[in-house]
C-alpha cells in the first residue's frame, strides 16, 4: 500500500520524486518523505499528512542532488508520524531506506541490534533494515543487502541509498511490487508504472528474491546469491494522460464514464464469428474440464463481489460447482485443494497480498490457477499458470468501478468458453449471450447519459445515516458491491442482505424513513422480491427499486423506481451496478468527501 519512487540521472531528483509520489497517491498513504544524496551527505525531508506538507518543507529548504528515493507510507508498524515516516536512516547516517511490506521478524532483529549497540528513533520495521544494512556494510552495499535479505522474513520492496556509493541505487523485492524504469542517461525505481510514465515507457519487473543495481546509464540484476539474471524489457503502451482526470472533477467519475470503452476493449478479439470464445493464452481443453471437480474463485473486496457473480454464471453456463472465497481467509482454513481443483484469482492491481498468498497456496496444493487482473506484468500475472487481462486501463480512484465491470466480462467469457467445451449450453443460447454481451457498452452509455436522476436523488438524500441494499440471486451479488461503494467513499453506514433473509433479523432495523435500495432485475425471482419489498414498506422503509425497463409492477408500490435497459438476466450486474456507482459518487460529493482517496483506505492492499 506504500509507494516507492527512486531516481538517478543528471536532473534534479527532488521534483521528479515529488511528482512520482503524486502519481502514487491512489495507493493510499498517511505520510511521505524523500532522501537526496548530494556532496557525500544524505538529506531527508519527511512529514505526516498529505504530500502538500512535504512540498512546503522542500520549498523552505530545497534539496539539491541528482540521486534520491521517495516514499508514501501507509502505517503498519508504528502510528502515522513524522518520525515513523520514510525514508529511514541508519544510525550513522550512512544508509537510507524506503520500504513497502512487512518485516515479520523485525522485533528479534531489533533486539539483537540493540544488543550490538544500535539505537532506534522510530517504531518501524524499516529502521531495522537500515541498521541491519549498516551492520553488514563493509564497503559493498550490494553484498550488505544480500546478507540482510538472508536475515529478514516477510514481504518487502526496498530502495536503498548509501553515501559511500553516490552513483547507484540498489533495490530488492519479495512479495511487494517494484519496477525499474529505463531512461536516456537516467533510470528509475517505482512501485507502479504511473509514477515514472512521464519519463519512460520501458520497464523491468523485479521478481521475488531479485536485486537491482541501478546507475544512471546501466542496470544490473542479480539473485540473492549474487548470480547475474537476464530480464526482458517491457514497453508500456498506455499514455500518461490515461492516468489524468481528463476534465472530470474526480478520477472516480472519469473511470465510471470509461466503462463502455473498457468493456469493448475487454471483449475485443475474444469473440470469433459471434459464436466462439478465445481466452488469450488460456488453453483449457474439454478433457481438462472433465477432470475438474470444483472451481475456487478467490479475491478481495470488489473483486470478491465480481467473483460472486462469476459463481452464478459459471455454475449456470458450465455446470461446474464453484466456491467463492475471501482471499484473506482462504489459505488459513487449509482448503481442500488438489489437481482436480481449478482456482481463479481476481485482482485489479495484481499486487493484492492476500490474493497472491492464496494463489501460491492453491498452486502448492496442485491446483491450476487462472488470474484475472488489469495489470500486465503484475505479481499475480507472473505467479498464475494462465492470465486473462481486463483491458480497463489504469484505475486511479481507490473505489474500483471499471475494473469491476471488466472483471464481470472476463468471467462471462470464461463461463461461455467452458460451456462451449463441455457442451452444457446450446449454440443458439451461446450466440444469444454473445450478442447481448456486445450490446452492453451502449447500454452502459445510456445509463451514463441519463445519470441526472441519480444525481438529483443523491442531492436529496445524502444526509441519511443508514442504507440497506437488498436483492436475490445476482441482484444480491450486485447489492454487496453497491453497498461497499457507498460506505467506502461517502462514509454512510450501509449493508447488503439477501432479501429473503430480512425476516431472520435485519427487518428489526427498518423503521420510518430507513432508506432501502431494492434490486429487482431477476425475472424468475421478481414475485418473491416484490413480497420482500412490501415487507420493508410496511415497516416504514423508503424504498428505491431498480428494475428492467418495461417492468411496471413496482410503480405505486415503492417510493421511486430507477430503470436499467433490458438484457439477459445473467448480464444484468454489468448494468445494475452503474447507477449504484453513480449513487455512491454523488452522495460522497454532496457530503464533501475525498472521493478519490477515502479515509483509511488504499487502492492496492499489498500487505496481509
Curated annotation (Swiss-Prot):
**What Gene3D superfamilies is this protein classified in?**
Glucose-6-phosphate isomerase like protein, domain 1, Glutamine Phosphoribosylpyrophosphate, subunit 1, domain 1
In the UniProt entry, which residues are flagged as the active site? Answer: 2 (nucleophile), 603 (for fru-6p isomerization activity)
Under the heading Pfam families, the entry gives: GATase_6, SIS
Which of UniProt's keywords are assigned here? Aminotransferase, Cytoplasm, Glutamine amidotransferase, Repeat, Transferase
Domain Glutamine amidotransferase type-2 residues, every copy: 2-217
KW Metal-binding (keyword) present: no
Q: Which reaction does it catalyse?
A: D-fructose 6-phosphate + L-glutamine = D-glucosamine 6-phosphate + L-glutamate
Q: Name one GO molecular function term.
A: carbohydrate derivative binding
Classification via SUPFAM superfamilies: N-terminal nucleophile aminohydrolases (Ntn hydrolases), SIS domain
Q: Identify the EC number(s).
A: 2.6.1.16
UniProt cross-references to PROSITE patterns, sorted A to Z = GATASE_TYPE_2, SIS
Q: Which domain of life is it from?
A: Bacteria
GO cellular component annotations, sorted alphabetically? cytosol
Entry keyword annotation includes Cytoplasm: yes
User: Which residues belong to any copy of the SIS domain?
Assistant: 285-424, 453-598
GO BP field: carbohydrate metabolic process; fructose 6-phosphate metabolic process; protein N-linked glycosylation; UDP-N-acetylglucosamine metabolic process
Subcellular localization is given as:
Cytoplasm
**Which NCBIfam families is this protein grouped with?**
glmS, PRK00331.1
What HAMAP family does the database record attribute to this sequence?
A: GlmS
Assembly and partners?
Answer: Homodimer.
Q: What does this protein do?
A: Catalyzes the first step in hexosamine metabolism, converting fructose-6P into glucosamine-6P using glutamine as a nitrogen source.
Which protein is depicted? Glutamine--fructose-6-phosphate aminotransferase [isomerizing]
Q: What gene is behind this protein? A: glmS
Amino acid at each position: 500500500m506504500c509507494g516507492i519512487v527512486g531516481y538517478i540521472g543528471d536532473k534534479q531528483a527532488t521534483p521528479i520524486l515529488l511528482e512520482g509520489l503524486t502519481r502514487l497517491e491512489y495507493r493510499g498513504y498517511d505520510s511521505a518523505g524523500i532522501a537526496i544524496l548530494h556532496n557525500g551527505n544524505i538529506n531527508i525531508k519527511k512529514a505526516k499528512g498529505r504530500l502538500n506538507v512535504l512540498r512546503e518543507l522542500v520549498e523552505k529548504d530545497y534539496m539539491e542532488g541528482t540521486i534520491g528515493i521517495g516514499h508514501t507510507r501507509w502505517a503498519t508498524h508504528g502510528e502515522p508520524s513524522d518520525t515513523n515516516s520514510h525514508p529511514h536512516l541508519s544510525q550513522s547516517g550512512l544508509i537510507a531506506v524506503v520500504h513497502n511490506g512487512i518485516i515479520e521478524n523485525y522485533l528479534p532483529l531489533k533486539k539483537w541490534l540493540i544488543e550490538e549497540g544500535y539505537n532506534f528513533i522510530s517504531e518501524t520495521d524499516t529502521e531495522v533494515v537500515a541498521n541491519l544494512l549498516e551492520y553488514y556494510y563493509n564497503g559493498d552495499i550490494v553484498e550488505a543487502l544480500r546478507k540482510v535479505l538472508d536475515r529478514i522474513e516477510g514481504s518487502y520492496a526496498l530502495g536503498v541509498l548509501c553515501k559511500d556509493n553516490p552513483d547507484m541505487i540498489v533495490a530488492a523485492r519479495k512479495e511487494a511490487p517494484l519496477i525499474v524504469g529505463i531512461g536516456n542517461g537516467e533510470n528509475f525505481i517505482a512501485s507502479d508504472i504511473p509514477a515514472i510514465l512521464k519519463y519512460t515507457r520501458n520497464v523491468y519487473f523485479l521478481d521475488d528474491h531479485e536485486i537491482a543495481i541501478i546507475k544512471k546509464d546501466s542496470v544490473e540484476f542479480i539473485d540473492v546469491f549474487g548470480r547475474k539474471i537476464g530480464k526482458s524489457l517491457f514497453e508500456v503502451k498506455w499514455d500518461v494522460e490515461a492516468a489524468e482526470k481528463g476534465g472530470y472533477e474526480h478520477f472516480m467519475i472519469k473511470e465510471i464514464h470509461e466503462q463502455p470503452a473498457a468493456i469493448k476493449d475487454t471483449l475485443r478479439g475474444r469473440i470469433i464469428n459471434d459464436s466462439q470464445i478465445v481466452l488469450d493464452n488460456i488453453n483449457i481443453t474439454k478433457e481438462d474440464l472433465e477432470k475438474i471437480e470444483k472451481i475456487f474463485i478467490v479475491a478481495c473486496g470488489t473483486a470478491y463481489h465480481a467473483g460472486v457473480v462469476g459463481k452464478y454464471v459459471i455454475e449456470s453456463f458450465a455446470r461446474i460447482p464453484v466456491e467463492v472465497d475471501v482471499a484473506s481467509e482462504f489459505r488459513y482454513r487449509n482448503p481442500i485443494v488438489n489437481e482436480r481443483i481449478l482456482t481463479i484469482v481476481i485482482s485489479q492491481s495484481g499486487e493484492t497480498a492476500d490474493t497472491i498468498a492464496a494463489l501460491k497456496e492453491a498452486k502448492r496444493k496442485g491446483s491450476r490457477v487462472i488470474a484475472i487482473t488489469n495489470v500486465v506484468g503484475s505479481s499475480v500475472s507472473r505467479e498464475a499458470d494462465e492470465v486473462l487481462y481486463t483491458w480497463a486501463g489504469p484505475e486511479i480512484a481507490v473505489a474500483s468501478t471499471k475494473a469491476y465491470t471488466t472483471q464481470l466480462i472476463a468471467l462471462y467469457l470464461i463461463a461461455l468458453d467452458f460451456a462451449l467445451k463441455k457442451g452444457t449450453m446450446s449454440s443458439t443460447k451461446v450466440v444469444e449471450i454473445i450478442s447481448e454481451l456486445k450490446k452492453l457498452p451502449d447500454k452502459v452509455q445510456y445509463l451514463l447519459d441519463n445519470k441526472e436522476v441519480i444525481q438529483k436523488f443523491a442531492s436529496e438524500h445524502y444526509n441519511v445515516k443508514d442504507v440497506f441494499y437488498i436483492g436475490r440471486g445476482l441482484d444480491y451479488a450486485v447489492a454487496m458491491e453497491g453497498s461497499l461503494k457507498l460506505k467506502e467513499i461517502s462514509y454512510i453506514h450501509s449493508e447488503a442482505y439477501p432479501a429473503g433473509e430480512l425476516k431472520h433479523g435485519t427487518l428489526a432495523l427498518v423503521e420510518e424513513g430507513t432508506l432501502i435500495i431494492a434490486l429487482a432485475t431477476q425475472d424468475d425471482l421478481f414475485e418473491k422480491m416484490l413480497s420482500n419489498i412490501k415487507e420493508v414498506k410496511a415497516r416504514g422503509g423508503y424504498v428505491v427499486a431498480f428494475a428492467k425497463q418495461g417492468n411496471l409492477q413496482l410503480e405505486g408500490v415503492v417510493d421511486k423506481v430507477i430503470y436499467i435497459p433490458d438484457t439477459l438476466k445473467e448480464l444484468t450486474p454489468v448494468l445494475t451496478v452503474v447507477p449504484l456507482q453513480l449513487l455512491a459518487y454523488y452522495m460522497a460529493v454532496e457530503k464533501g468527501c475525498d472521493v478519490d482517496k477515502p479515509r483509511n483506505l488504499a487502492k492496492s492492499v499489498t500487505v496481509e
